[in-house]
Amino acid sequence: MSKRISILGSTGSIGRQSLDVIAACGMSVAALTANSSVERMEEQARQFKPELAVLMDEKAAADLRIRLADTNVRVLSGMEGLLEAAAIPSADTVITAVVGMVGLRPTLAAIREGKRIALANKETLVCAGQLVLEEAKDYGAQILPVDSEHSALFQSLEGNKDRGEVKRLILTCSGGPFYGKTREQLQGMTREDALRHPNWSMGAKITVDSATLMNKGLEFIEAMHLYHMPPEKIAIVIHRESIIHSLVEYCDNAMIAQLGAPDMRLPIQYALTWPKRVPGPANPLDLWNCGPLTFGSPDLETFRCLALALEAARTGGTAGAILNGANEAAVAQFLAGKIGFLEIADRVAQAMAKVPVVREPGLADILEADAAAREAAL
Ligand code: NDP
Ligand code: MG
């Protein structure tokens, strides 16, 4: 069970919910990091008293240093600071809750210190899953999933001793805010429309990914890496209610699932307390009033991002890094009002067609694929 924790991305949706869990479970904080949210970071640092607070942005870090001058909190900036927070000796666990590929180097730094990784930053696994898992094995670092679907799979696999008995993993997908819409209807969807998720309140990037269904595609690749499963042994089912968080189907056709209210504090907490369970702040599920549970198939023709991600999953090598880099660039453009909703998939397809895939990539190949994909997408 975790006792002292570093959070990379503490001011975001996962970061703040992680602090709720840490406070409720009596754990302590070694380091906090964010990009530029000075005020929120100051508040968090005063409340949780970490040794180290890091802001990626230099100017924001200088401001934070002045604001925290009356405390013992050391303030750093940039990637150097992020790496120091990830490897800080007093922490046994690092929660990776930054958004995007920027999380890769700090995740590797934490792994090399043998820390438990509570992994929310799925982009890291999509880009460099094989590398990250090999390093985790070499350094004896545990990786525990924070993503609700992967936590559900993890919990549904806990009783299983022989992976050969697993027929397939089934990821549930809410369908997002645009479920049931046609391509014509999606044409004019704006930033505001995309940011209205029916079941979860999350950061802007992942909320857009949930609207395009790219999020489920990223999760598909994340599951392949975390559970060593080939793409043909993973399926996606639309489940609008987000009550069943994912399932494992075994060779005898038994299905084991994990259910819960849609509340990220539960999977965050389990990544910290595993193999124990303790009472925590997550909302209980009221089975008697949650209504019927429904299931359906995803529409891969309307939601092209999901089809592109499945293609990248089957291709392997740097295809995941290309998919992800192009998507990060395209989503940033969509959020800035520069491209339309359907153009996100166009940009990703464009990058996948243009950037060559490297088999068995090292870190340099992955970083190169990411940069080339971002350029090709713009
Ligand atoms: P948010 O956008 O809410 O938060 C992101 C955090 O990362 C903030 O602390 C932000 O700081 C920091 N950050 C952003 N960009 C950078 C950067 N370039 N360098 C350093 N720090 C940066 O995201 P979420 O919490 O929603 O998501 C975080 C990760 O967790 C993502 O990978 C997402 O896919 C995954 N995830 C999220 C879920 C959710 O429910 N939110 C569910 C499952 C997975 P600042 O505040 O200063 O911008
Ligand atoms: Mg998820």
Name what the model sees in each region.
Residues M1-L378:
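Catalytic, metal-anchored helix/loop core of enzyme active sites in primary metabolism
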